[in-house]
């Protein structure tokens, strides 16, 4: 990226263009009449001088006045006393999101009492004050005047009184600016101060100076700058480049994975398909481009060259392309490597890795993701677009009271707690210390009586709701109510029913067209299971559990003994550290290698995975698929075999993965075909909730519609298409807070159970449901959400279904919106296109047109448009030009309102916190004609002729033109009724690409035809007059200059360079002369190096006219003695055709030759010594010793071969001061040979020894360094995550203390491994938190080799969960002497906290530090410190601390004096307080 350039530099590159097109101005300032975007108040240690308290962000005395354009001002009403001051600006009475640099306070000094004015700009977050800055008065603000005024819509030529191009100082740095869209053309301008010529500045900042020229080569946005101190004037316009400048313009780079022009096809691709990837750069800005990609399955990184395919229609950008195809399912991670001379840039994904538009950096960046899935991957048709209902069986409905009390014990010999009141809240041991708690304090042992018969009894209710799939939480025998701790996989839990109950439920559900998915828990079992039997409850069965066998000293005595790894001390791995959930062990990294376990679950004829889909051989009484618990914590190959097993019973049966993040690696086609889409849930909540909220699983932060779209599109592009249309799109589950409570309502919480809270929450839920039911996937309803059930975190989220107490209005709404989905196939399998994503409104379209849905299935044509609005009521104009034709009529299935597409848009009325589901009316023709397949183009001088065949049902044709294949099309003609078209609006010398569409009588437009290229051009008549190069002395600073001329009638016979003419010099080494024979050994011969005799082509530059000809020149430096050959060539049509320089006859192509002879220096350099490279993954690092020479070393050439004897190919040249090189263009496992050749200034060469290297996958030593808060208890720091040997264990991976506040650990991990982690101090109660005390997302890295098989990660912990507040001083039980009458309390807490000391509130500084002086009485002083969140209540962030400080009593002879002094102090305090 580039800083502003001096005007002189800009003028040196100005090009003159004649075509001028109109453009509207774009000024990046708000109108003077705009409204304040926020409340801004200036706070600091001066506020007390204004009768306020210092650093008071709640002050109403220092609120700044909004002046428009983002500017605020505040002037102190009285003079501030002389002295030093600090201040900041806070927004909306909060430190959060402040408009200030967060790195420190701003300061000013007053030598004498003075009034001070503070300035703040909301748009740039800039702040200053009148002690250091004086703005130009409003009536004297600088403005642009000149011929540019009418071009940018800013008044008349050279009239300052009409100029609206007012420049403003947005950053308070005395640089005023104005931004506008400027059309292509030649302009002159100056800057005046105010609306007259009284004070004006021109070229070089000279007052009354010459006009400033500006020649703009293409329509572009330009910012004009004026420095009020130096009076210099400049712009940020960069003219077109003509060659390497060792810079890359970062702002012009672009790759957008959501735009099919840059990545086609969109989204995940099938094996064998080809994906086209493109990147944009400023035209002629980069010399080469490569794509570097990592294959997650093969564990290799490969670099592939890209090729320039053309430029944008306006000539501003160029495009590079690569096509990739993969024959195996995998996940690809890629970024771009771009070079221009000595500059290298990297272009990767954005910081959030959401796809879409990426980001350029100086170093390797985050990768874009591309999923490649098995072409045979599919899901059952009934899955795609069905509506799921999740049931927690114990809490849904009690259909059989006879089984309500069949359990004697829960876990071990713990009691069972049976509820007698269906409407009671679940027992929550978190509340055991609260008044009124009636539970037994034991987790998950309370039951309400819900059972399988209860579900069967309510199938008609579910059917009326529109449900077609039921997902049941675990139903197998278990000691707990959640049943994720399985006791016996072969039995239905006795409180739920038995096998016959199960079969009847399956049969009845299937009879009503409802499928059933079971919950499978195969990562762990219960410690109270028949398989583990920790408590010896099953000794009388005759089969030993693994734990009992271990107690007898021989774990093999149990048929389940090898399922678990029990250590000699009796400990074992429990899921996430819970000893109630012993984990199934892995052998060689997989549970499948535990044969008895694999046989039991997968391989046996009646293995668990198959049996429950086909109990006793009857598929109709079996379930239809599995939801699989903690899927990413079980080895992938276990799931591959699981898939193979269930496919023998029900092919493609659902395998729904529980995965809270990107699950693409599990969705490649060999196992899972759906996922619990928590990513969808979190995005929808963030958008609709519109405030920060910690729901216990994730911290939600407000986003707008554009960010919502980006996050949803990132899911769309990562998941295989059949999976995306079958994802479990949930809003809540048994693991999350109830969605109504997330949206603000909890019936059991007096702070959240008002009618207003409920009304708002219900509105939010309805809005979410509209989106959910209109979006592709399998929307899932968590039981009771549709009936108004609320609930907090587990276990409160598992309340009973409120039968008889339902919110019937909400139920009715859900039935309506679900059945709208069910009645419209387009909402199930129609395609998806974002139509509007701006601010509070999000709209997307669904289509089944031309009689086919997304998967090629035949359905009637239908179109839907779904709109949701979280803001105020409004009309939304939605652009439909690329989505559906004019005239199509729609009806809102929710409101009944009707709409029609007109002039390429549809205007939808949407209420506040409301939505619409527009469905096209039936009976409309939405089938377009077939696309044209035989379009042809013939290029001419100033024209292109197009032709094609007649298309059935077409009444007219539209013509589209671009400059590159695959996109950027502009419609250049419509309603063409012939099957030919001549385009005369072309510029000779440019490449054009055409496509044509067919349009029927209703306006339905076909897809684009086949693409054709055309090259209109002036024909070149002749090229020649190439000079003869004489005998040439070799040397690095001695180039050869070649001149030649070209003639093209109508092009070169005009003054100046012929537009779009390309000239190139070609040269090659021949090496068959006597001179070569004599000098070859010294100059040219490097053993194993094959001297290339191919042509090298370099661009030539126009140097002037020669009569009717244009003359060009190019240079090159010969680097070997002997004979060289050269020739020039010319093209007037982008290199599509070439004309070579002719001989004397003017007809025959003529290449000329010359001889290169040695210089006086014939002594070779000393040989560099190339060290043996170490083994690294995806790279080879070469190091060598420097060479010496009698004159000078020029550089080193690096050569590479796949054979020890060659041929060696030169891959790079480095300068004389560089003694290393990293080759990343390698493939792990391949063998490479290298040598380095020292080259002196006369091209004498000496080769090094040859080394052999084989890059391979080897472990990377990853060092994690973390800086922690200075108040952290000295109890150690751990790093917990999905590390292979310590999965999310906060007590493992103990770090080493490296400094007072730093810890470090080095772990060995495989390259390409994606690690998620957090820092903790031995337990999850002491895990890291964000700066506001909020839950933070998992940290994420991908292990890469940063060099020498190492990687370094540097992190900072903001806060800890267990330390919401810390007191630095004083310590508890501090004793001070009698003379100390007050003490300063210094502490640290989270941002935004409310802190009170002895019930007196104040606001801490932005960085969390606070200080407060507290008066001390004689004797023991009790200081009470309290902190709590300023917003939502959060028990973790609320804490009370009591400190005692004892002030000694004075000696007896001092008592009277001190008592008198204390009384005086108290009297003065009361006096000042009264004042």
Swiss-Prot record:
Gene3D superfamilies, A to Z: Glycosidases, Golgi alpha-mannosidase II, Immunoglobulins
Q: Where is this site: Transition state stabilizer?
A: 735
Task: Name the residues annotated as catalytic in the UniProt entry.
Answer: 629 (nucleophile), 658 (proton donor)
This entry's Gene Ontology molecular function terms read: alpha-amylase activity; metal ion binding; pullulanase activity; starch binding
> Which residue range or ranges hold the Fibronectin type-III domain?
928-1019, 1164-1257
Query: Which keywords describe this protein according to UniProt?
Result: Calcium, Carbohydrate metabolism, Glycosidase, Hydrolase, Metal-binding, Repeat, Signal
Q: Which InterPro entries match?
A: A-amylase_C, Carb-bd-like_fold, CBM20, FN3_dom, FN3_sf, Glyco_hydro_13_cat_dom, Glyco_hydro_13_lg-like_dom, Glyco_hydro_b
**Binding residues for substrate:** 524, 627, 734-735, 794, 798
A GO BP entry is: carbohydrate metabolic process
Q: Name one Pfam family in it.
A: Alpha-amylase_N
Q: What are the required cofactors?
A: Ca(2+)
Residues spanning the signal sequence? 1-31
Q: Where is the CBM20 domain?
A: 1255-1362
- Entry EC number(s): 3.2.1.1, 3.2.1.41
Q: Which reaction does it catalyse?
A: Endohydrolysis of (1->4)-alpha-D-glucosidic linkages in polysaccharides containing three or more (1->4)-alpha-linked D-glucose units; Hydrolysis of (1->6)-alpha-D-glucosidic linkages in pullulan, amylopectin and glycogen, and in the alpha- and beta-limit dextrins of amylopectin and glycogen
Record: residues binding Ca(2+) 2:
398, 400, 403-404, 449, 451
Which residues are Ca(2+) 1-binding? 245, 247, 285, 340
Superkingdom to which the source organism belongs = Bacteria
Report if keyword Kinase is assigned.
no
Similarity comment: family membership: Belongs to the glycosyl hydrolase 13 family.
What's this protein's name? Amylopullulanase
Species this chain originates from: Thermoanaerobacter thermohydrosulfuricus
Q: What is the lineage of its organism?
A: Bacteria, Bacillati, Bacillota, Clostridia, Thermoanaerobacterales
Give the encoding gene's name: apu
